[in-house]
Amino acid sequence: MTGFYSEHSKVWVSVDCIVFGFEEDKLKLLIGKRQMDPGRGEWSLYGGFVGPQESLTEAAQRVLQDLTGLQKLYMRQVGAFGAIDRDPGERVISVAYCALINVKDYDDSLRERYGLEWVPVENMPKLYSDHNTMVKDALAMLRRHINTEPLSFNLLPELFTLTQLQHVYEAILGTEIDKRNFRKRIKQIDFIEKTDKIDKLTSKRGAALYRFNSKAYDEDPEFKL
């Protein structure tokens, strides 16, 4: 058995994490400048190699926890990227994962420690290797699922206004949404609950605050917007 494996060249496997946040009505991406060769100084996603005792998912969870200090994040595999020349250092196949976080939950000291920046997706710079393609594929994945899965709530605080929720959808879809129709549909969804609290910070008149009832959704996980 050992001889069989030794006859084949070694290929490295890594994970790269595409971390999206929502701030100032914009969908943002967490990136930093590479501190090693190849590509030193280039903008890049954050990732790491898969350990010998790790699954792909476990490796991505480890990287995300190191990066954000957060656990139990929404995370989804985007795909595998294995172009022969994607990494000039070694033959590396990377599996990309998309994560959604509430920016307010993110420990800013960790961002500073890793030298990371929140960059609006619409102004995303050229990234290292095929990382722009990873982000593009992750965004396409979110657009495919946002109307059939409650993804957007991962980007919002526990209590949010309908305006904030609409802006998340518009930021991900890249288009404006009719306010009247959006609110009419939202009010038909049982697990988006209106609370008795009022937002007086982002609304001059005071806007009602809503919350996502995950328990109610789990009991009847049908979502279509």
Where are these regions (language model features)?
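Short, His- and charge-rich active-site/binding loops that engage polyanionic ligands
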Residues: L29, K33-M36, R40, G47, ...
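N-terminal strand-loop-strand
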Residues: T2-W43
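Active-site segment of metal-dependent pyrophosphate-handling enzymes
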Residues: V11-V13, E58-Q61, Q65-D107, N123, ...
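Short helix-coil junctions and helix-kink-helix linkers
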Residues: H167-E176
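RNA substrate-recognition surfaces in RNA-acting enzymes
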Residues: I177-A208
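Long, intrinsically disordered, low-complexity Ser/Thr/Pro-rich regulatory/activation regions
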Residues: K197-L225
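Conserved Nudix-box catalytic region and its N-terminal flanking loop in Nudix hydrolases
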Residues: K26-L70, G82, N147-H167
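NUDIX/MutT-family hydrolases
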Residues: C98, D108-L142, I146, L155-T163, ...
